[in-house]
Regions:
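Catalytic donor nucleotide-activated moiety binding site of glycosyltransferases and closely related
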Residues: 1-9
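Catalytic binding pocket for nucleotide-activated donors in carbohydrate/polymer assembly enzymes
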Residues: 10-154
C-alpha cells in the first residue's frame, strides 16, 4: 500500500495552494494541467519537481532552481531540499514567482498557440515542396499566423 498503508484524504487544488511547497510526482495524472493550475495561481508555492525520464513539451524550457526545485526520483533528498528552501526564503519566493511567470508565458492559451505555431512553421519548412492546397482544404492563412506570432510569441 502507498506510504506503508497510510493514505491521506484527497485535497482540492484550492487547498493545495495554501501550502508553501508542492511536489509534482510522475504517475497517472496530468502534470501539465497541474503545473498550469498550481503555478499560475495567485498564491505562489514552490514547485518541487521529481527528476524523471518522463516529460512534457515544456520541460526543456524549465530550469531547476529557477522555476522549480528538483528532487531525486526516489525522493531521498526531499527533506534536505525543503530545509534548503526554508533556510533561503528569499530564493524560495523568487523560484515560486519565476514558476508562476513561466506558466503565464508558456502554458497560457497564447503560450500554447505559440508553441504550435513554431511546430507548424518547422513542419511547413520541411514539407514545403510537398504541400498542396485545394479548394476543399480548410486552413488558417499563413499571414494570420505571422500576424499573431509577431504580437504574441516569444
Amino acid at each position: 500500500a502507498a506510504l506503508g498503508g497510510m493514505i491521506a484524504p484527497a485535497v482540492s487544488m484550492r487547498q493545495m495552494l495554501r501550502y508553501r511547497y508542492l511536489v509534482i510526482v510522475d504517475g497517472n495524472n496530468a502534470p501539465s494541467s497541474r503545473y498550469a493550475t498550481l503555478l499560475g495561481a495567485t498564491s505562489p508555492s514552490v514547485m518541487i519537481k521529481q527528476n524523471s525520464s518522463f516529460g512534457e513539451w515544456f520541460y526543456p524550457l524549465m530550469k531547476p532552481f529557477v522555476h522549480y526545485l528538483p528532487v531525486h526520483h526516489d525522493f531521498g533528498d526531499l527533506t534536505q531540499l525543503i530545509s534548503y528552501a526554508r533556510d533561503h526564503p528569499e530564493l524560495a519566493e523568487e523560484i515560486a514567482w519565476n514558476g508562476r511567470d513561466f506558466v503565464w508565458k508558456y502554458l497560457s492559451f497564447d503560450g500554447v498557440l505559440c508553441h504550435w505555431h513554431s511546430i507548424l512553421m518547422r513542419m511547413r519548412s520541411i514539407l514545403a515542396d510537398d504541400l498542396t492546397v485545394n479548394e476543399r482544404s480548410h486552413y488558417v492563412p499563413l499571414t494570420l499566423w505571422k500576424m499573431y506570432a509577431k504580437d504574441k510569441c516569444w
